[in-house]
Swiss-Prot record:
It comes from the Bacteria. It comes from Yersinia pestis. Na(+)/H(+) antiporter that extrudes sodium in exchange for external protons. This is Na(+)/H(+) antiporter NhaA. The keyword Transmembrane applies. Belongs to the NhaA Na(+)/H(+) (TC 2.A.33) antiporter family. Keywords: Antiport, Cell inner membrane, Cell membrane, Ion transport, Membrane, Sodium, Sodium transport, Transmembrane, Transmembrane helix, Transport. GO terms for cellular component: plasma membrane. The chain crosses the membrane at residues 14-34, 59-79, 95-115, 125-145, 154-174, 179-199, 213-233, 254-274, 292-312, 328-348, 363-383. One of its GO terms (biological process) is regulation of pH. It is a multi-pass membrane protein. It is found in: Cell inner membrane.
Amino acid sequence: MTNIIRQFLRQEAAGGLILIIAAAIALLMANSALQGVYQSFLDIPVSIKIASLDISKPLLLWINDGLMAVFFLMIGLEVKRELMEGSLAGRDKAVFPAIAALGGMLAPALIYLLFNGADEVTRQGWAIPAATDIAFALGVMALLGNRVPTGLKVFLLALAIIDDLGVIIIIALFYTQQVSLQSLGIAAAAIALLAYMNWRGVGKTSAYLLVGLVLWVCILKSGVHATLAGVIVGFMIPLHTQDQRSPSESLEHGLHPWVAYLILPLFAFANAGVSLQGVSLSGLTSLLPMGIATGLFIGKPLGIFTFSWLAVKLGIAKLPDAINFKQIFAVSVLCGIGFTMSIFIASLAFEGTDIALTTYSKLGILLGSTTAAVVGYSLLRLVLPARRKAVNVR
């Protein structure tokens, strides 16, 4: 395993533990005497005015639209690297996790629709349980230390990256509001400029980020979700230049600590603070939260394991070396941790609707993700080899 992937896994695992702490603090504040302080923090108005450009949003939306664009920039960089040189490079490497990820997105969505397909409003949340929180999942896996085979970590990483790519496509196709053609036209010009810079071998990361900032503003104004700008910029930054430098790798290396230790925990803190005031048992067991929780805890492992097993049995893909189906099943349960990505989709799906829908969807996400984390960890402990003890040689 390359040093890049090792460092990635270490930072994701540590970041996952910080995520848990941030979410717990948010829940405590939202349900204590500090609720007002918590809400006031999220409502802080932040404005940027440059000439005729005026963007005014509360801090919560700057986190969701702005900082999360940086997260998706890193996702774009990661996906490009893995597709060209990493765990997804070549058909043989990519097929198994790709098929597993497809099953892990289809089954949860279908299960959610079994619960909520008849309701025109809650039906919009069908993609909520389709997401996997890679940082959280790797954080739980890290608790088992060196008992986890490298191949299993890489499988989870590859599966989650493909899952992220699927979520990006879902956001672009299904969670886009009314579109401004003028803003989209300028955005298209910015994308064309980025592509030209890539073709010409421009190696200055700052040039891509400057054009990317223009792209982010245009996409924000267009009605398409602004986080997509981050993915596009990530794909456009060259992996290698003529002088053998890697602008993409350098930027990913620089961004990763900020994303793992600040941006994602801040997103979790801003979005996980669900007030339980007014929450009833009947509401908690209603179709919306139950559809999400069941989709995450049952749908994810059902889809990932079934598609993986069929792919191997039909000869479409090969099981990675030194990994068995018991371990695949345990990891597939762990992939039911949707958390930040699921909360992000829920905020898009129920934007402008009854606040109760957002509240109960978050509770469903927390219920499903927590159950998946506990059961997934327990299963991994059972199926992984015992920790090797050091032997003193005299």
